[in-house]
A protein has these predicted regions:
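N-terminal cap/lid segment of alpha/beta-hydrolase-fold proteins
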Residues: 1-14
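Conserved HGGG/HGGXW glycine-rich cap/lid loop of the alpha/beta-hydrolase fold
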Residues: 13-63
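Short beta-to-alpha linker loops that shape the active-site pocket of alpha/beta-hydrolase fold enzymes
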Residues: 33, 57-60, 67, 125, ...
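Active-site loop/oxyanion-hole signature of alpha/beta-hydrolase fold enzymes
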Residues: 55-96
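Conserved hydrolase catalytic core segment
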Residues: 91-133
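Flexible "cap/lid" loop of the alpha/beta hydrolase fold
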Residues: 120-152
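Conserved serine/cysteine hydrolase catalytic core
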Residues: 159-232
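Catalytic active-site module of serine/aspartate enzymes centered on a nucleophile-bearing elbow/loop
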Residues: 225-278
Length: 278
């Protein structure tokens, strides 16, 4: 398997990226708060025989350089665009956005729509979540998990460093200032580009806050006329860790639909029992 790790200069930042495989369209992974490329390597390796996969450390995380505080999703999307240019990645690409990475993936699509072939949103944050959820906290569990996963051995131990933890908290606080006006895309803006939205499971008890979270994700599914919304019944916020095959299948289905033009309603090959349709 062809794997290349490098650092590229994008504006004031040195950004670390690893590229797996060599088929097109490329799959580009945008991690969660504090997430590093390494947390997605297992997924990237599994896809490398079918697509070129770009996993990068969003500044200031992982092996990338420090970045200014409170950058906007559009600034982060422009950084990603610079990374793809520096790596010579052809467009359009399939974007995979996890948690806050979903906001950044949509910001990228808002700025560079013609460079997006499809999208997978993995328990994505939503620009209106603060207003809709108001004091209900299921989506904030993602932050707590980002801070505790290193202790479980699921993310690099360096995330226990104070500087990285402070960066996660700053990014989290910046996300709280997002409003509906910050949405880069309206329903239908992705046209018929394939889109799969994955939502974490409700847990042992279905709480009204989870239902609101699911409804926000149903709204995200309306960005494309060629979309699916699936609930990962057995997963927490880190679906790519708890149900990796569901995430892999979603990415493969979006790739297939982007390549062939066959709608997801006909192409979905998800194994029974791995998630429920919404």
């Amino acid at each position: 398997m062809d794997v290349k790790t490098t650092q590229v200069q994008v504006g004031p930042h040195r950004i670390a990226a690893t590229v797996f495989g060599d088929a097109e369209p490329a799959v580009v992974i945008e991690p969660a708060f504090g997430g590093s490329a390494q947390s997605w390597f297992a997924v990237a390796e599994a896809l490398a025989g079918q697509a070129k996969v770009v996993a990068y450390d969003r500044a200031p995380y992982g092996a990338s350089s420090r970045a200014q505080d409170d950058r906007t999703p559009r600034e982060i999307a422009r950084d990603l665009h610079g990374v793809l240019d520096a790596l010579g990645i052809g467009r359009p690409v399939v974007l995979v956005g996890h948690s806050a990475g979903g906001v950044y993936a949509r910001a990228f699509a808002g700025l560079y729509r013609d460079e997006v072939a499809g999208m997978v949103l993995v328990d994505s944050a939503h620009e209106a979540q603060e207003q809709v959820l108001r004091g209900q906290l299921p989506w904030r569990v993602g932050l707590l998990e980002a801070l505790t996963l290193p202790m479980l051995g699921l993310l690099p131990a360096k995330m226990l460093n104070g500087a990285d933890r402070r960066s996660i908290i700053r990014e989290f606080r910046a996300s709280k200032r997002l409003t509906a006006a910050d949405r880069p895309l309206a329903p239908g803006d992705l046209g018929d580009r394939p889109l799969i939205v994955l939502t974490r499971g409700p847990g042992a008890k279905v709480h009204p806050s989870w239902q609101l979270w699911r409804d926000l994700h149903a709204e995200l599914a309306e960005l494309s006329t060629n979309s699916r919304h699936l609930v990962a019944d057995d997963s927490n916020h880190y679906i790519h860790k708890s149900e990796p095959e569901l995430v892999l299948t979603a990415i493969r289905d979006v790739l297939d639909s982007a390549r062939t033009g066959v709608p997801l309603s006909q192409a979905l090959t998800r194994a029974p029992g791995t998630g429920s349709e919404r």
